[in-house]
């Protein structure tokens, strides 16, 4: 990010922000409500266009690109509130995230390869939802939905993973498990 400024009708959400990341690097952005943390992620993912500045990923400018095209470049995001397919099972949610290429026909025909099934099983263990594999995602607790969405993001194998408040709304026990 180079000199990113975002102004909403005169309110400066971000003011001349600069940030660079290297492969494998982990960063946490901490601040009070309204400090611009989500706006910062929105700029990277194309949800918000900055008033000024540039965003580069893999040497390409992200400014003006559509959100889905930024995702295809390898940018994955988990939002504050869990966004899972509530009418699908936990397993089906994960099948969507690990299917490659992202083809509706692959999903309809259930063309999931053995290595993808192994990946789903691994992700289920990571999020401790193996016993809920056939449960509808809508029946999960808020915390379990958060975990499922994180697993879905991991299953996509993004080159850049943006996670916005992953423990928001979790109980103390769920936060400790996370």
Where are these regions (language model features)?
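Glycine-rich phosphate-binding loops of nucleotide-dependent enzymes
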Residues: 1-178
């Amino acid at each position: 990010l180079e000199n990113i400024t975002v102004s909403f009708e005169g309110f400066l959400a971000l003011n001349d922000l600069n940030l660079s990341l290297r492969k494998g690097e982990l960063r946490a952005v901490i601040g009070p409500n309204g400090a611009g943390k989500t706006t910062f992620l929105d700029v990277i993912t194309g949800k918000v266009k900055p008033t000024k500045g540039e965003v580069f990923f893999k040497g390409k400018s992200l400014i003006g690109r559509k959100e889905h095209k930024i995702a295809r470049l390898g940018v994955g995001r988990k939002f504050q509130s869990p966004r899972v397919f509530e009418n699908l099972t936990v397993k089906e949610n994960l099948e969507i995230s690990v299917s490659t290429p992202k083809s509706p026909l692959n999903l309809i025909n259930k063309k999931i390869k053995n290595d993808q099934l192994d990946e789903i099983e691994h992700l289920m263990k990571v999020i401790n939802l193996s016993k809920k594999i056939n449960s509808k995602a809508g029946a999960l607790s808020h915390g379990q939905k958060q975990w499922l969405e994180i697993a879905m993001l991991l299953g996509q194998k993004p080159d850049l993973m943006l996670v916005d408040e992953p423990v928001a709304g979790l109980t103390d026990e769920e936060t400790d498990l996370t």
